[in-house]
Amino acid sequence: MINYMLGKLTEQVRESVTLQKDGDLAAAFGGYELVFEALRFYEGLGYGKETENIQRLALEAQPSPMMTLYCHSLILFHRRHYTCALEAIEAALAVAPEITMLHALRGRVQTALGDLPGAYETFSQIQSRDPAFGGAADSLFVLTAEKEMPGEDYYDWLQHFHNWLRPASYVEIGLGHGRSLALAGPDTKAIGVDPYQGFWGRLNYVCPHGPATLFPLTSDDFFAQYDLREVMGRETFDLGFIDGLHLFEQALKDFINLERYARKDSVILIHDCLPIAPVVAERERCTGFWTGDVWRIIPCLKTFRPDLKIMTIPTKPSGLGAVTNLDAASTVLADHYDEIVHYYLSLNCPERFDQRRVVCNVGIADEDYVQGIFAGSTNRTDI
């Protein structure tokens, strides 16, 4: 299956090369980005020669030294060789200082290196020089997230939960390109649900221990058509991750449906529970960096389900909610679903980040602390 994915990534590079020749640079480099990000995953699995060949295919297709340097910097960025990436993009800028996308990559590399003032200056200059370039505004949100939530990103925290719990069963709602689903360990039966991405042809990642079971359905249709116990081959799941439709009412439905198959010590993780700014939490997407209004689920659960243990881990880019002490027999949320949705949709997202931290029940981004709450090594009640 990994060879299939590497072959698919090779074809994606060829498609991006064609787009680039046709003049569609945005689509071309969007495609390159996805490929280079995925290649780092496979390089980490020991497929260094194969990933290098795919990277070379993209590099050799570049029509000028400037574009070759840009592409090289992008590869180094995704391999996390940030100092070398900065050197490459600075060399490209020396050749073509008027190209906005070069400055944008420079700002991203500066962010990764921890030079937040330098990155802020870079993106601010882009906004002044090229107001039509929407990526600068989104990058400023990323910068703010880096400042407010330093340290590991949510993929790192997902990996921690897999390491702590070593789940026999893992259910993921909303797959993206498959990166989080591929974190499942060798003894985990992984199940992925997504109406658009629930096909191997649309994913870029596959678990090295064996492919997950995919369901190309909405989560509502999945739970209506399938008994999760039969799909898992067991009565309960160990770890669930909700990252589907970014609307409060859907996240709440997904939580209700998952909890019916939970044990008390099962854990449900919910992405996008700490928006970096109110505008990214709008119900209708108006920014590239977007969380939707999933944040509402945290105060909702705190109010209607005081029996649950809940916290939001302040991890970039948009927080990770974590819930345990679950009760499969509880019907409180389902019984009051309409009134809950009506009430919580009337609330505004707090303007200040410190206010959002309180409303979203933000805890400490400390591995020992979080493990103590959600992996059973202690019996904390202080959340």
Describe these PLM feature segments.
Residues 2-241, 245-269, 273-383:
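A short alpha-helical cap/connector motif
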